[in-house]
């Protein structure tokens, strides 16, 4: 239950490119608009000489400051620097990423004249703080509890790292839930009045950076995930990348100049490509235009929908593979699917819709829920359920989710011995007995892996621990039990117990490689607080500066209007004071708030003597 005085629990869709926040209020979900009036907020954080910007403000200045504007943290979170996907993404990022301790990717930026380094969890935590602040401004109360969503195909380390980001942001993460499952709740509530009996629903969720497909059965408020598949590295940004590459080559052909090393030019081109991609979802042709793209050369090039489709056809077709896998895993024929639901901004692409519709033999796709907001909507419902706030309409909903990847340990010969199969409903617990492989073996190394391959070398290692103190005995005699326990966030605990001695050891699989330690998180929480107070200081400063500027211009205008009523000497004296303040403002852009306030007082006192004189005269 949420504690009193903590405000309602919110649902946050933490996206690769955009994030969205919702809350259950007055018996319905409210998707909350930010201070710009937008219901989704860019997952961008920018660092400048004077301030930190998050959301729209960060994305709006990206062309001016590409190397210090960080986005795509979700493509780094819970991954290793040496991951092939990280290496390929780095080619498209203007900001610097280098390997930190234990192969953890670290982001380097320049902030207030100093080089700073951040983990992906910290950048994501800044976006989470922004989403919380958007909700707090709307609700007028402080918020502590949240449900945060992740791609269904996120692995254990990516989930754990997302949870850590929530902790750094000062949130109590009630639950990590899968994005397609959250979207299914939005669909289920939308269809509740008209739905009778069991429905098999396929959620096709193609976002800015990740892709998930989940197949659920929905009956009487029970949402049971049968299977899930996907690609944690496929989305709208990959379609943008293809377009950017195409136009970089075209620019090279036409102008014999290579812009690939110019971060600002690439960013401006990318923004134009993103806009063109969106336009091509509703028209057959558009133009990509960027004035003075590189060395004063204007870039102007038409692009047709057909050309855009041709550039990305292999990626669009790739989207169909997880659909087939999902049907296979849930042992269902495509004719048994009642509804195919589109989620995520990239499902607006006509070709993606056409391929999906053709796969389902011309079946109408379900477009009744908002693809940008459905995930946050479902997260807000789940937040209301977990904090006991929802009405009877939602309190009887039950979510039965699954684990996306098989989990097991390495046994002799590097074999993967699976304890929990993929698509097992969570929470889940499974025990299995093992024995020693060498005579008088005193301890056993237990290595935990996730993946579907027969050899552990081809799977992903999650962590390892040692069970020691096994009494000397011939091999095959000692018996020890390994227990896998997955909680409702999809996070794994593994324990082992020696039968004879009762000795135990356990590990929460948190990917020791690259996982933030308790101390790291504590330090980051404190830094987040520090950045927050710096942001507030900066805001105060800007308000004081604007206040002084407005005051100087306003009294200047009033002075001109008064014209002849004032003696020339007084008028001149005051005009000089205003001129001096305006000059001072130009020279002291970075002054502190109290300096602006002090100048304001000086100007006010000069003005009040003049006014007094005038009325006495």
Curated annotation (Swiss-Prot):
A GO CC term? chloroplast envelope
Q: Which Gene3D superfamilies match?
A: 1.20.1270.10, 3.30.30.30, 3.30.420.40, Actin, Chain A, domain 4, Substrate Binding Domain Of DNAk, Chain A, domain 1
Could you list this entry's UniProt keywords, alphabetically sorted.
ATP-binding, Chaperone, Nucleotide-binding, Stress response
Molecular functions (GO terms): ATP binding; ATP-dependent protein folding chaperone
What superkingdom does the record give? Eukaryota
Keyword Ligase (UniProt): no
Pfam families under this entry? HSP70
Q: One GO BP annotation here?
A: response to heat
Which InterPro entries does the entry mention? ATPase_NBD (IPR043129), Heat_shock_70_CS (IPR018181), HSP70_C_sf (IPR029048), HSP70_peptide-bd_sf (IPR029047), Hsp_70_fam (IPR013126)
Q: Which family does it belong to?
A: Belongs to the heat shock protein 70 (TC 1.A.33) family. DnaK subfamily.
Q: Which PANTHER family match?
A: HEAT SHOCK PROTEIN 70KDA
Protein name, as recorded? Heat shock 70 kDa protein 18
User: What is the source species?
Assistant: Arabidopsis thaliana (Mouse-ear cress)
**What broad taxonomic lineage does this protein's source fall under?**
Eukaryota, Viridiplantae, Streptophyta, Embryophyta, Tracheophyta
């Amino acid at each position: 239950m949420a504690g009193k005085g903590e405000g309602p629990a919110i649902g946050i869709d933490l996206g690769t490119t955009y994030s969205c926040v919702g809350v259950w209020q007055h018996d319905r979900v409210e998707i909350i608009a930010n201070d710009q009036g937008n219901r989704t907020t860019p997952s961008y954080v920018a660092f400048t000489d004077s301030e930190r910007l998050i959301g729209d403000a960060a994305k709006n200045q990206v062309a001016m400051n590409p190397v210090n504007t960080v986005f795509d943290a979700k493509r780094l979170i819970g991954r290793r620097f040496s991951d092939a996907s990280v290496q390929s993404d780095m080619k498209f990022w203007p900001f610097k990423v280098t390997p930190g301790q234990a192969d953890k990717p670290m982001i380097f930026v320049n902030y207030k004249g100093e080089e700073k380094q951040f983990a992906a969890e910290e950048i994501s935590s800044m976006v989470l703080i922004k989403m919380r602040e958007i909700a707090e401004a709307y609700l007028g109360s402080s918020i502590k509890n949240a449900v945060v969503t992740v791609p269904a195909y996120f692995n254990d380390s990516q989930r754990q790292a997302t949870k850590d980001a929530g902790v750094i942001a000062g949130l109590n993460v009630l639950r990590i839930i899968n994005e397609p499952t959250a979207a299914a709740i939005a669909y289920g509530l939308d269809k509740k009045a008209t739905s009778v009996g069991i429905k098999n629903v396929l959620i096709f969720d193609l976002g800015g950076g990740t892709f998930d497909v989940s197949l659920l059965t929905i009956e009487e408020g029970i949402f049971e995930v049968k299977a899930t598949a996907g690609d944690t590295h496929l989305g709208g940004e990959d379609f943008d990348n293809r377009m950017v590459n195409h136009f970089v080559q075209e620019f090279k052909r036409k102008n014999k100049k290579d812009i690939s090393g110019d971060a600002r030019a690439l960013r401006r081109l990318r923004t134009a490509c993103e806009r063109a991609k969106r336009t091509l979802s509703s028209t057959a042709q558009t133009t990509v235009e960027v004035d003075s793209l590189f060395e004063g050369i204007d870039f102007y090039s038409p692009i047709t929908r057909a050309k855009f489709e041709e550039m990305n056809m292999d990626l669009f077709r790739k989207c169909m593979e997880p659909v087939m896998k999902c049907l296979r895993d849930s042992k269902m024929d495509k004719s048994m699917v009642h509804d195919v639901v589109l989620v995520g901004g990239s499902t607006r692409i006509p070709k993606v819709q056409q391929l999906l519709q053709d796969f389902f033999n011309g079946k109408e796709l379900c477009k009744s829920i908002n693809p940008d907001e459905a995930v946050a909507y479902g997260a807000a419902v789940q937040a209301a359920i977990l904090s006991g706030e929802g009405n009877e309409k939602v309190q009887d909903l039950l979510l039965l989710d699954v684990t996306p990847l098989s989990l097991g340990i390495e046994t002799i010969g590097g074999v993967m011995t699976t304890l929990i199969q993929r698509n097992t409903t969570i929470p889940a617990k499974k025990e299995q007995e093992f024995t020693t492989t060498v005579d008088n073996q005193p301890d056993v190394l237990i290595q935990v892996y996730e993946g579907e391959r027969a050899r552990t070398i081809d799977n992903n290692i999650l962590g390892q621990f040692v069970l020691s103190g096994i009494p000397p005995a011939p091999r095959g005699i000692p018996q020890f039990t390994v227990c896998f326990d997955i909680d409702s966030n999809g996070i794994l605990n593994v324990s082992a117990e020696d039968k004879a001695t009762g000795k135990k050891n356990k590990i929460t699989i948190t990917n020791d490689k690259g996982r933030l330690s308790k101390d790291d998180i504590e330090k980051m929480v404190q830094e987040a607080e520090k950045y927050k107070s710096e942001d507030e200081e900066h805001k105060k400063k800007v308000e004081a500066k604007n206040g002084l500027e407005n005051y100087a211009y306003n009294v200047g205008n009033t002075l001109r209007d008064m014209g002849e009523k004032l003696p020339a000497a007084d008028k001149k004296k005051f005009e000089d004071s205003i001129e001096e303040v305006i000059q001072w403002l130009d020279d002291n852009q970075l002054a502190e708030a109290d300096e602006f306030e002090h100048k304001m007082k000086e100007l006010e006192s000069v003005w009040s003597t003049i006014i007094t004189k005038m009325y006495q005269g």
